[in-house]
């Protein structure tokens, strides 16, 4: 059963952080991103998720105040097709929902052949870095 976790309250978050904001970023896959357990150089699921999370962070960053950051709270992603190391991967993140300090995103990834390789949902929470972890 899913459970909501209460994260530290934040004082201020810029009000222009609204659903519908989109960030698209293209990355070149590297050997560090490969699925090491395979004999071939194939882009790994953890690396894809990392790029998706990073794109969400970049999308949200300009809307945060100086002492704010986001932390990941949930990932629900499908990795649907292989991508060879060296290919480009384009990640699209769209902010779907803002509820207090909780953010929900749609994420997709496609390779440079235009093939969709992954999609899903990601959740993050805005935290005050001056107070986070100091309870």
Task: Give the residues covered by each predicted segment.
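A cross-taxon signal for low-complexity, glycine/charged-rich
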Residues: 1-4
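Catalytic strand-loop segment that frames the active site of acyl-thioester-processing enzymes
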Residues: 7-44
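HotDog/MaoC-like acyl-thioester-processing domains
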Residues: 19, 85, 95-135
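A structural signal for short, well-ordered beta-strand segments
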Residues: 23-29, 75-79, 93, 107, ...
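Conserved N-terminal beta-strand and adjoining loop/helix that marks the start
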Residues: 45-49
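Hydrophobic beta-strand-centered segment that forms part of the acyl-chain substrate-binding groove
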Residues: 57-90
């Amino acid at each position: 059963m899913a459970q909501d976790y209460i994260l530290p309250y934040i004082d201020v978050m810029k009000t222009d952080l609204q659903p519908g904001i989109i960030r698209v970023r293209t990355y070149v896959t590297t050997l560090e991103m490969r699925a090491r357990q395979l004999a071939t150089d194939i882009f790994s699921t953890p690396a894809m998720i990392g790029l998706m999370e990073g794109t969400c962070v970049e999308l949200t960053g300009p809307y945060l105040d100086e002492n704010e950051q986001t932390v990941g709270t949930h990932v629900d992603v499908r990795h649907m097709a292989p991508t060879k190391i060296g290919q480009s991967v384009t990640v699209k993140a769209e902010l779907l929902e803002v509820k207090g300090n909780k953010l929900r995103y749609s994420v997709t990834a496609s390779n440079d052949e235009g093939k969709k390789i992954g999609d899903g949902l990601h959740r993050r929470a805005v935290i005050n870095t001056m107070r986070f972890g100091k309870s």
